[in-house]
Regions:
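Catalytic cores of soluble metabolic enzymes centered on carboxylation/carboxyl-transfer
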Residues: 2-211
């Protein structure tokens, strides 16, 4: 995040120093502007003591980047996160004139991430960024150890939203199959014009397991 608050590329400086060149600026000459916050999206399960959660990413969509947010990742839809290497999926960076603006930009971007197929710490990151002690900048390296399991889970709103989206998809897919499997009758209101499991005098039940 240093490049956001200084406008300088310190990695480039390291390469110059390794080639025997002097540092371009002294510490006193480096000026800071604004704030920047970085998080790392990992294929880990925070609710299980951050155990690695390798697997195949079945769906992945990154948010659109802008001047206040950037996502760095080499992972694409369909990639496999191996248990043999570091399970980092991406880095997210938010920046702005104030700490609050930087955090808000990062929260917005993380909320737009769509990832299915593997366990990850997205919910934990969102909970951390929304926590008042973090927003106020009064946390230390022992802060995570002080949290409970409930602080590591996805926000309930995201869980409900995911279930609603899945249910809507299943219903829509079922309607499509029913429409294309129905008998070609002239009466669109006839129960025989649909193939949805309707039975005379019986309740229609459908059980769907969402994973």
């Amino acid at each position: 995040v240093s490049e956001y608050i200084t406008g300088l590329d310190f990695v480039e400086w390291q390469i110059h120093v390794a080639n025997g060149k002097a540092l371009p600026l002294k510490q006193s000459e480096i000026k800071f502007r604004g704030h920047a916050v970085e998080v790392r999206l990992y294929a880990e399960d925070p609710e299980k003591n951050f155990m690695p959660a390798p697997g195949t990413i079945k769906h992945l969509k990154w948010p659109n980047e802008n001047e206040n947010c950037r996502i760095d990742s080499g992972i694409e839809n369909g990639d496999v996160v191996s248990p043999h290497y570091d399970p980092m999926i991406a880095k997210g960076i938010g920046c702005g004139e104030t700490r609050e603006i930087a955090i808000a930009a990062l929260i917005k971007a993380l909320n737009e991430i769509e990832i299915i197929g593997i366990g990850q710490n997205l919910g934990f990151l969102l909970n951390m960024l929304n926590a008042k002690p973090f927003v106020d900048g009064i946390v230390d390296t022992a802060y995570v150890d002080s949290l409970g399991v409930e602080d590591f889970a996805l926000p309930k709103e995201m869980k409900y939203q995911a279930l609603a989206i899945a249910a809507k998809h299943i219903i829509a897919a079922g309607d499509y199959i029913n429409t294309n499997s129905a008998l070609p009758l002239m009466d669109p209101y006839s129960p025989w014009s649909e193939c949805d499991g309707w039975r005379l005098g019986e309740n229609q039940n459908k059980s769907v397991r969402l994973v």
